[in-house]
């Protein structure tokens, strides 16, 4: 699976890595993290196991395949407790260039 997880219960400010600038082909390119997908998960015994199917479906969709292809590092997912719905909410983050962020936002955006 191309999407990994290294974060679980941090604060929102700790989920995003700091933006940075890197020189690629003689041009300065800015990279930053973007939330590219989210979905709810009910109160199940092993939510990470059940989250595999929606993560895989999104990864195989047009938007997910584009993000996996254009992400600078592997996209990663985060599980957060959803107190309003008595379950969990999963978020997928990807590190993209500014131009890729604009393209992604115009094409798919956060729905």
Stretches found by the model and what they are:
Residues 2-85:
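Structured alpha/beta or helical-core interaction and ligand-binding surfaces enriched in interleaved
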Residues 76-111:
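Short, compact, well-ordered microdomains
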């Amino acid at each position: 699976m191309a999407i990994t997880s290294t974060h679980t219960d941090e604060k929102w400010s700790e989920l995003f890595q700091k933006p940075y600038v890197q020189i690629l082909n003689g041009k300065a390119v800015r990279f930053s993290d973007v939330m590219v997908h989210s979905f709810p998960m009910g109160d199940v015994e092993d939510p990470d196991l059940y989250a595999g199917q929606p993560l895989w479906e999104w990864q195989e969709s047009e938007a997910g395949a584009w993000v996996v292809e254009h992400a600078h590092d592997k996209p990663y997912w985060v599980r957060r407790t959803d107190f309003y719905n008595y379950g969990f909410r999963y978020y997928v983050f990807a590190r993209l260039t500014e131009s890729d962020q604009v393209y992604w936002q115009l094409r798919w955006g956060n729905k």
